[in-house]
Amino acid sequence: MLIFLSPAKSLDYKTPPHVATFTQPAYLKQSETLIKQLRKLSPADIANLMHLSDPLALLNFNRYAEWSLPFTPENAKQAVLAFDGDVYDGLAAKNLTADDLDFAQQQVRILSGLYGILKPLDLVQPYRLEMGTRFANKAGKDLYAFWGERLLEAINAELAGMSRPVVLNLASEEYFKAAVGRKINGEVIQPVFEDWKNGKYKIISFYAKRARGLMTRYAVVNRLSEPEGLKAFDYDGYAFVPEVSDDKSWVFRRRES
């Protein structure tokens, strides 16, 4: 089973990593190609392209300028520890053991606009480049054109080595589209997290994002390599609801939040 996550806009490079193990992203050559193109943009260009405030645009202008190879623990950080925000708050990777992270390295993949696909312990330098950005490049009009075939090949190669090829999609549609817009050779299971509000169950973005991280953590600490074990997921009061689920969409609900 492969578990897909989105990256995060918020980054944490202040907290020292609690593990020394690291790996290198598989597509640094392609990342460098994108960085070279991004360096041609002014802060105003970046603000317009990514709909950022002037301070955020300047921050990322400087990030692109400072991005450099090779990646080392001195100038980069493991992806799962660098990404912050709702999903990663739920995952709480800073509290995972080295053995947990080793298991996550086999099961979890983070889709990225700059790095393509990341393993949790792959080193990354700070950046902002969402997969949905309409950033024209030699491959086409956007990052889906740039990454699509590469991601599909990488994912299918991993799935081909599994006795039961299955993807648990905990990434957003923006990121999953980069891979699933084409054909993944395996089952795809999409968890849906709903909370009770105003007399009915509904998806509440903040809670749903955090639940994606919680489910990833549940899979990691319980060493789940098959999706069926996730039906027992009960973190933060969520429970699987079979009567509103089907083979592809697994619904988890909670009454109180």
Swiss-Prot record:
- Cellular component terms (Gene Ontology): cytosol
Domain of life the protein comes from: Bacteria
Q: Which Pfam families match?
A: H2O2_YaaD (PF03883)
List, in alphabetical order, the GO biological process terms annotated in this UniProt record: response to hydroperoxide
- Fetch the PANTHER family from UniProt: PEROXIDE STRESS RESISTANCE PROTEIN YAAA, PEROXIDE STRESS RESPONSE PROTEIN YAAA
Q: Which family does it belong to?
A: Belongs to the UPF0246 family.
Under what name is this protein listed?
A: UPF0246 protein Daro_2893
Q: What organism is the protein native to?
A: Dechloromonas aromatica (strain RCB)
